[in-house]
């Protein structure tokens, strides 16, 4: 029985019921006391894989919790589901497609069949095509319409054609190649285009239009704006091919735009947008960091793929993180999850993981179309430390919601300044420690008395200084951010999302909810510009249309 055809209702499994009973046993569990009772707790609940060190000891778990979660994964036939994905089965059931972003990072010589055809030769042909293009640009051989070498590459794309590539190219800035600057244009807001164009020279700018359909509204409008800007700056239609390339499965539309066929990189139906940075969608990454580092990124992801497929569940990073997510969401009532990178270069990882997790697991029906019987994807949010400590960490520490968190931190910085990195690392650890330890009423009172405050003032202030603690977190440590480790980190989160989708019985690889707004947007636009006179479907939308039409000037 295939999970994507007949998904299990995990809530009916014996292990799910056992976990529900176990949750009640842990009602008074305190992590602070657990560390006192078990000096080996850190060693028991931490390990390394693929260049990542995971400490999951600061969680609301005992060893029997992990045993029960692993039992849940086994009863849900997670191993079969993992095998089905890597074997190319059509696990995206609603669209009847395989899910094979993992094929993009497999070595040459491997064999992956889609409809009986081995796709690996085509994968490596495109990688070779990327290698040639990046080499031409970096060596100054790709010239603009005035024969000047390209100095700026602009990626025009949105969603998965933007978030993943932006994350990687900025996370790996220490590896940026000299002579070529990379930029991203995603939003349809004209101000974004204006600000970017003001920093560019049309003679030396290459645009990458990334859209599977070559019809994504925001991307097409920005591509048209870039084309008009290029022509206004002195470029010609005849030389347009020097300044525009495409990543798309709609070759005809890209050619009609003016892009030469040999400069169109393919996309495949078996790679979803939010999983596509490993494909030619990653061209801006390769332009930024060089093709050899891009291949290191692929290698790191491949290493995580191997770990995911072969490591026992109790020592499998994506499996454990996925199980812990289900533990908190379905048994502790957690509705969100914080991503807290303590590294400036990783500042965009939360944006990418928001799409990866929320677009994948933001579902309310199972693979077979029946309603889910459990909670599904959480809200993903967060941001770079230490900034968050002076903003939303207050809610993490003293708010009423249980919000699990992932701390991500490197041991070494590429840019050491005095003892800044030691303080950064210390802040990361102390935040996870504070979430776990908290501060009792007795400790708060003792602290205030030690400052010499009168007893009345101690009693007045003490309740405000109590911090509940017992808030769960994981800490992921890398020695230093590199292409290989970053590839492993991103692939880890991809697989974590898949694990959770299996336990919830949902399809992590479609996104039908995104389409409704697009469809309605066309009607709203027609009414805004006056080409559609019938009123909108509701009074609120029509009122806002009227407000715009009564005030908009140009």
Curated annotation (Swiss-Prot):
Pathway(s) where this gene product acts: Carbohydrate biosynthesis; gluconeogenesis; Carbohydrate degradation; glycolysis; D-glyceraldehyde 3-phosphate and glycerone phosphate from D-glucose: step 2/4
Alphabetical UniProt keywords: Cytoplasm, Gluconeogenesis, Glycolysis, Isomerase
Residues of the active site: 359 (proton donor), 390, 518
Superkingdom, taxonomy of origin: Bacteria
Enzyme class at the top of the EC tree: isomerase
Subcellular location: Cytoplasm
Pfam families tied to this protein: PGI (PF00342)
InterPro entries xref list: G6P_Isomerase, G6P_Isomerase_C, Phosphoglucose_isomerase_CS, SIS_dom_sf, SIS_PGI_1, SIS_PGI_2
EC number annotated for this UniProt entry: 5.3.1.9
One record GO biological process: gluconeogenesis
Functional summary from the UniProt entry: Catalyzes the reversible isomerization of glucose-6-phosphate to fructose-6-phosphate.
NCBIfam families xref list: PRK00179.1
Family: Belongs to the GPI family.
Protein name, as recorded: Glucose-6-phosphate isomerase
Lineage, opening ranks: Bacteria, Pseudomonadati, Pseudomonadota, Gammaproteobacteria, Pseudomonadales
Gene: pgi
């Amino acid at each position: 029985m295939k999970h994507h055809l007949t998904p299990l209702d995990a809530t009916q499994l014996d292990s799910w019921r056992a976990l529900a009973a176990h949750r009640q046993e842990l009602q008074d569990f305190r992590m602070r006391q657990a560390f006192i009772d078990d000096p080996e707790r850190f060693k028991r609940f931490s390990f390394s894989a693929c260049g990542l060190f995971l400490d999951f000891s600061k969680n609301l778990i005992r060893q029997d919790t992990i045993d029960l979660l692993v039992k849940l994964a086994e009863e849900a036939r997670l191993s079969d589901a993992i095998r089905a994905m890597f074997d190319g089965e059509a696990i995206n059931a609603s669209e009847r497609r395989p899910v094979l972003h993992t094929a993009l990072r497999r070595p040459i010589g491997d064999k992956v069949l889609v409809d009986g055809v081995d796709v690996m030769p085509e994968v490596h042909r495109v990688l070779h095509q990327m290698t040639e293009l990046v080499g031409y640009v970096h060596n100054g051989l790709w010239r603009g319409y005035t024969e000047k070498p390209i100095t700026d590459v602009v990626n025009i794309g949105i969603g998965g054609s933007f978030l993943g590539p932006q994350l990687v190219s900025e996370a790996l800035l220490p590896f940026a190649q000299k002579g070529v600057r990379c930029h991203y244009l995603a939003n349809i807001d004209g101000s974004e285009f204006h600000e970017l164009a003001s920093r560019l020279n049309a003679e030396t700018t290459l645009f990458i239009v990334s859209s599977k359909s070559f019809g994504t509204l925001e991307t097409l409008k920005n591509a048209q704006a870039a084309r008009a800007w290029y022509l206004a700056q002195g470029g010609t239609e005849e030389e347009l091919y020097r300044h525009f390339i495409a990543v798309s499965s709609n070759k005809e539309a890209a050619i009609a735009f003016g892009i030469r066929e040999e400069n169109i990189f393919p996309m495949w139906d078996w790679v979803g947008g939010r999983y596509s940075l490993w494909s030619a969608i990653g061209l801006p990454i390769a332009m930024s960091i060089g093709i050899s580092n891009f291949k290191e990124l692929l290698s790191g992801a491949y290493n995580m793929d191997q770990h995911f497929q072969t490591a026992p569940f109790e020592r499998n990073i994506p499996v454990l993180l996925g199980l812990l997510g289900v533990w908190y969401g379905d048994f502790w009532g957690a509705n969100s999850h914080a991503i807290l990178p303590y590294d400036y270069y990783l500042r965009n990882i939360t944006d990418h993981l928001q799409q990866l997790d929320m677009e994948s697991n933001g579902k309310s029906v199972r693979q077979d179309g029946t309603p889910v019987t459990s909670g599904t994807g959480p809200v993903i949010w967060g941001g770079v430390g230490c900034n968050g400590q002076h903003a939303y960490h207050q809610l993490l520490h003293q708010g009423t919601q249980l919000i699990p968190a992932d701390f991500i931190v490197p041991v070494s910085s590429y840019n050491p300044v005095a003892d800044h990195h030691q303080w950064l690392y210390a802040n990361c650890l102390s935040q996870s420690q504070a979430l776990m330890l908290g501060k009792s009423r007795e400790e708060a009172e003792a602290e205030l008395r030690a400052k010499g405050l009168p007893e009345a003032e101690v009693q007045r202030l003490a309740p405000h200084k109590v911090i509940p603690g017992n808030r769960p977190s994981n800490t992921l440590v890398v020695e230093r951010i590199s292409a290989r480790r970053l590839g492993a980190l991103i692939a880890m989160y991809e697989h974590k999302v898949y694990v959770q989708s299996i336990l919830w019985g949902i399809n992590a690889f479609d996104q039908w909810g995104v389409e409704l707004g697009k469809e309605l947007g066309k009607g709203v636009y027609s009414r805004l510009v006056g080409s559609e006179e019938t009123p909108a479907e509701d009074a609120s939308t029509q009122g806002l249309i009227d407000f715009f039409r009564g005030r908009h000037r140009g």
